[in-house]
Design a protein with these regions (language model features):
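Conserved catalytic scaffold of divalent metal-dependent phosphoesterases
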Residues: 1-21
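Active-site neighborhood of phospho(di)ester-bond hydrolases with catalytic His/Asp-centered motifs
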Residues: 20-28, 40-44
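Acidic, His/Gly-rich catalytic cores of divalent-metal-dependent hydrolytic chemistry
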Residues: 34-124
Length: 124
């Protein structure tokens, strides 16, 4: 599920699950969207840059005090060390490179809008 996914699809899922909000992850690109049936939060993924050309990753903070308004934070870490350890452990070199460049080696899983935004800073 991505920001560009048809809002009707997200609304159908919210309605079907009888949820006020859905908190999802793993798509790799964080976003927040208020819809007619509820709110969709996507945290991104903590272990991989968001294909935005930045070596930092993202995480989402939600508290009741904020009335469940999202606060997205960048997480900086020693990406060179992490990349080198991945290489030492014979993990996929494409992922190790992504840690140092902030862009994914391919965009096959992305809808067109997100694929075209590769390397662009996120505004969330």
């Amino acid at each position: 599920m991505f920001k560009s996914t048809d809002p009707q699809i997200k609304n159908e899922i919210l309605k079907k699950t009888q949820s006020e909000f859905i908190l999802a992850g793993h798509c790799g690109i964080p976003f927040y969207e208020e819809l007619s049936e509820g709110i969709w939060f996507n945290t991104g993924v903590i272990g991989m840059p968001a294909n935005d050309g930045q070596t930092s990753t993202w995480y989402l903070e939600l508290t009741e005090n904020q009335n469940f308004k999202p606060v997205y934070h960048k997480l900086s870490y020693d990406f060179e060390l992490a990349s080198n350890k991945m290489i030492q452990e014979n993990l996929p070199s494409e992922y190790a490179k992504t840690l140092t460049t902030g862009v994914w080696d391919n965009c096959d899983v992305l809808p067109e809008r997100e694929a075209k935004a590769q390397g662009q800073s996120l505004n969330i």
